[in-house]
């Protein structure tokens, strides 16, 4: 898988522990509570590997709506410039005329990701670094591309939105140690 890096040797916990970041395990995000956060990325970013992020987002919302009625919040990248926001113009227009229920946009510059995901059911990401932040904070991730660093510890299929397959805690901890 593309999300594997380095020499593939399990690392001890000392580096992780030296950071002082606490991992409390997966949150209990089951049931009817919680929104879905879709993490947009900067259009043309190399980690997208020629994927059109706007088309991916539309396709993702369509696929999710087949399987869930949960609220969906599409989060813009916090580093997008005003000019760069123009790269999402097609996406904004498409959603303005689409009849999707309970889909909103969140400005990633104005809402800190920590606040945005604290009541999330899960984060859906192509290959955004927000996947790592979500896992560290116990929020499940659907990582749809093998280049997503959380691909090996999260769900990988949108159709499983209501029954997420997540890595067991020992695997997640080892993944964190290996980062």
Regions found by a protein language model. Give the residues of each.
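Short loop/turn segments at strand-loop or loop-helix junctions that form parts
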Residues: 33-45, 74-79, 145-146
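Structural motif
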Residues: 35, 71, 121-122
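Short catalytic/ligand-binding loop motif for oxyanion handling, primarily in non-cytosolic enzymes
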Residues: 45-48, 80-85, 132-133, 150-153
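Catalytic donor nucleotide-activated moiety binding site of glycosyltransferases and closely related
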Residues: 61-109
